[in-house]
Amino acid sequence: MKLESQFLSFLYSRGYFNQCTNVSALDQLMSKQCVPTYIGFDCTAKSLHVGSLVQIMILRYLQKFGHKPIVLLGNGTTKIGDPSGKDKSRTMLCSDEIEENALGIYDVLKKFIKFGSGSTDGLLVCNAEWLDDLNYIEFLRNIGRHFSVNNMLTFDSVRLRLEREQNLSFLEFNYMLLQSYDFVELNRRYNCLLQIGGSDQWGNIVSGVELGRKLQLSELFGLTTNLVLTSSGEKMGKTAQGAVWLNGDMYSPVDYWQYFRNVRDEDVGRFLKLFTELPLDKIKELELLQGHEINEAKKMLATEATKICHGEEIAKNIAADALKVFECNDDSGLSTFYVDRCDVDLGLPIIKLLQISGLEKSSSSARRLINDKGCKINDVVVLDVNYKLSLEHFCNASYVKLSCGKKRHLKIMLKSSF
């Protein structure tokens, strides 16, 4: 695809670009002027996780290429819940929880983009500003009349739930109208012309573009990014231990570095393009590495991704500590997992320990690991699937080193009792 604007060309070359409404007109516009662009995040948790990282990186690049990134926090729409990609309704959150989550998300985003009053500074907006005081009758007359239920039923977020005979509340069914209305309000208030979201948001985004056209606003544009899956078909940002959060108190910078260090070989090149700011020629060099050498590319991925999220100094320190751990047998940089003393006193089965620590997802995978001689306690291979961790392991040491293969290691420590 031949594109003139630096921003769209960049998205396409790095693998972000999925589809776009009237891409030629948007390309011309973005090559000539600053285009205010919004990406929305619902306030369903106190942080964002790696699954949102593509959108956050795009906010960062909007700023880099001279456009204005608008972050819309859905403290209004979170009260309803987006049905896109969901099998069931979300748990309803109270207003205090939503506001606390919004503050946490803002703290995360400040690490990635600069907020301020400049022409390309990030702008934080909350949609409760206009949604909380909506007059329902006026909203139906002025906005609702532009939506066809027949058309809404064809969108995946609705159609798939109905086909699977899963409940879709009227509350959730309204989400599309509210997201479309958000776009209109952002255009009226801040001259926002472009909305970007994941590929699962295409229906909602197009509805907003169409609503703008029917209300005779300036032409609005929508762009979606590719859904990022690992080579094993899993969504980004999930591990056996839970979500890979972007704030350090919910997911440590060390664990964040290790998450990217341990990606599959097949994912390294793609993730370097998506989650680092390395130039493409450097990434091409790293993609040529084969065999054991590919670990150097993984270390680069981990360090560069951690640098953006947690800062350069922290990233370099973690990389240096990892070098000691994996190449100099120094355990000081390992993540720590705590176990209850009473469980260890009774004898903690190695199968259970591998699961609760997050090193293995299931008992069957833990058994396979042991049978393949891939599990070690203090660098000694565990041969018995019935092996148990006991207090004797801690007689002369403050921790036990638990290893799965060559890459995954944890320090197992006893919880302090007070």
UniProtKB/Swiss-Prot annotation:
Pfam family, one: tRNA-synt_1b
InterPro entries in the cross-refs: aa-tRNA-synth_Ic, Rossmann-like_a/b/a_fold, S4_RNA-bd_sf, Tyr-tRNA-ligase, Tyr-tRNA-ligase_bac-type, Tyr-tRNA-ligase_bac_1
Reaction catalyzed: tRNA(Tyr) + L-tyrosine + ATP = L-tyrosyl-tRNA(Tyr) + AMP + diphosphate + H(+)
Motif residue range(s): 'KMSKS' region: 235-239
Boundaries of every S4 RNA-binding domain copy: 348-413
Cellular component aspect of the GO annotation: cytosol
Residues at which L-tyrosine binds: 38, 175, 179
Record PROSITE patterns: S4 (PS50889)
Enzyme class: ligase
Keywords of this entry: Aminoacyl-tRNA synthetase, ATP-binding, Cytoplasm, Ligase, Nucleotide-binding, Protein biosynthesis, RNA-binding
Compartment annotation: Cytoplasm
A GO term, aspect molecular function: RNA binding
Chain location of the short sequence motif 'HIGH' region per the record: 43-52
EC number: 6.1.1.1
Binding site for ATP: 238
GO biological process assignments: tyrosyl-tRNA aminoacylation
NCBIfam families: tyrS
Recorded family membership: Belongs to the class-I aminoacyl-tRNA synthetase family. TyrS type 1 subfamily.
Complexes and interactors: Homodimer.
Summary of the function given for this chain in its UniProt record: Catalyzes the attachment of tyrosine to tRNA(Tyr) in a two-step reaction: tyrosine is first activated by ATP to form Tyr-AMP and then transferred to the acceptor end of tRNA(Tyr).
Full protein name: Tyrosine--tRNA ligase
Originating species: Ehrlichia canis (strain Jake)
Gene that produces this protein: tyrS
